[in-house]
Amino acid sequence: MSIPVPEPLPPDLLQETAATFGLLSASVRLQILWLLASGESDVGTLAEATGQSVATVSHHLAKLKLAGLVRARREGKRQVYFVDDSNIVELVGLAVEHHRGPAEPKTHRARGA
């Protein structure tokens, strides 16, 4: 019995999906999404939680917002950021769980070792 092969993705969808994974390849952006997955937050709180400067976090939030991965709303003088797409929350959670494992860290052998 053969396993069915799915149809190839349309080039534009493939490009957009690759761009999303590219954005998530920066550990700071991944950490920001991880934190926002558990609730909304402002830049200062995210900066403190990530150990990054407010300017750095603002820069990464702008990229995430432009890509549609986070949204923002104004509360008085501050911007509050949040993730309202359950698919993004699930994607980040699945990636984290994929790498979270037993207490012993995984070791990877270098090629040719």
Task: Name these PLM-found stretches.
Residues 1-16, 86-113:
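Amphipathic alpha-helical dimerization/coiled-coil segments
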Residues 25, 63, 85, 102-103:
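Generic alpha-helical secondary structure signal
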Residues 60:
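Residues within the DNA-recognition helix of helix-turn-helix
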Residues 65-75, 82:
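Beta-hairpin "wing" of winged helix-turn-helix
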